Amino acid sequence: LRQAGAPLTIEEIDIDDPGPGEVQIRTTAAGVCHSDLHFIKGLHHTSMPCVPGHESAGVVEAVGPDVTYVEPGDHVITCMSAFCGVCRNCTAGRPVLCESTEHWRAPGQPSRLSQKGQPVTQLYNLASYAEAMLVHERACVKVRHDMPLDRGALIGCAVMTGFGAVVNTARIPVGASVVVIGCGGIGLSALNGAAVAGAGTIIAVDVSSKKLAAARTFGATHVVDASVEDPIAAVHALTKQGADFSFEAVGRKETVEQAYEMIRYGGTTVVIGMVPQGQKLEIDAEALLMEKTLTGSNMGSNRFREDIPQLVEFYLSGKLHLDEMVTARVNLDDINEAFAAMSAGEVARSVIVFD
């Protein structure tokens, strides 16, 4: 990506040798995620040029000095929430909010990626829309060799983000009523998480009849087509007093505000979607006095070294519906078309598969 709003280009770049604590990974698969699209459109910002991609899996090819966690041949899923293990948030059990930058290369060191001697930014310190990645060892987790990596890649972002928002951030109790706005990969994962956690009423909201049909496969007990009916009124009709929990998985100001209107007194709204930078939310201040909670979820409040192996087990035991989530498998050359299909709402998830 050379500038926001421009198509992605396929180019040759240089990748450095692994330094201390670093791992080189041969990329096997990478999901096409909305988070990358925000940077491509310029709704969020980073240094250019950059290599996007963060939802990925692959095989370790080489390790640098002091690497003890993985070795060549290990199958891994990457995660952008790398951790240090010693900062305030890490020691409090919230590594997803790690305050350290020690897993980045320090200023003055060579860039991990470069082109003609000029640095190329790794988006989220991963840059997985490439044949190989160079990451810190604390940005990946080993997984079983019988886990298909083209589905395992999705666990590194969409699945962990949506599923984790339900079970880690909200910690919904058995029997809770849940509404999820947005039935892309993250929203479908939130529905799946609600079903696994034992929610009672599970409502999916979207404007795509195709996505709403898929939502039932992932655990929705009811669906609401927001293009033909008032979603707030529909949720209140289904839950009588409003849902116990709502999850916004779109990333729009309007849908966050709708999600908050959908919950009952004492209920909780969890924002998962990436609302554009600078956007302000408007909510009824009086509702706060009725103990209606509005909170965010960063990458599903994950502890990914523990959560990802558990999600792998859920998939292999049939509880996590990754096969149904993968709508298309494409080559890297088709990446712009894959983003166009996602923008048009034609797919739940496309996966780039590398030979």
Where are these regions (language model features)?
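Short Gly/Pro-enriched turn/cap motifs at secondary-structure boundaries
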Residues: 3, 14-15, 47-53, 121-125, ...
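Glycine-rich beta-strand-centered segment in the early N-terminal region that forms part
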Residues: 16-30, 43-91, 96, 142-146
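Mid-domain Rossmann-like dinucleotide-binding core that forms the NAD(H)/NADP(H) cofactor-binding site
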Residues: 72, 131, 138-140, 144-229, ...
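Local beta-strand N-terminus motif with an aromatic residue
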Residues: 73, 175, 220, 242-243, ...
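Cysteine-cluster motifs in flexible loop/terminal segments that predominantly coordinate metals
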Residues: 79-138
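Glycine-rich cofactor phosphate-binding loops and adjacent beta1-alpha1 units
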Residues: 170-174, 186, 196-197, 207-209, ...
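C-terminal hydrophobic helical "lid"/dimerization subdomain
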Residues: 257-261, 265, 287, 305-355
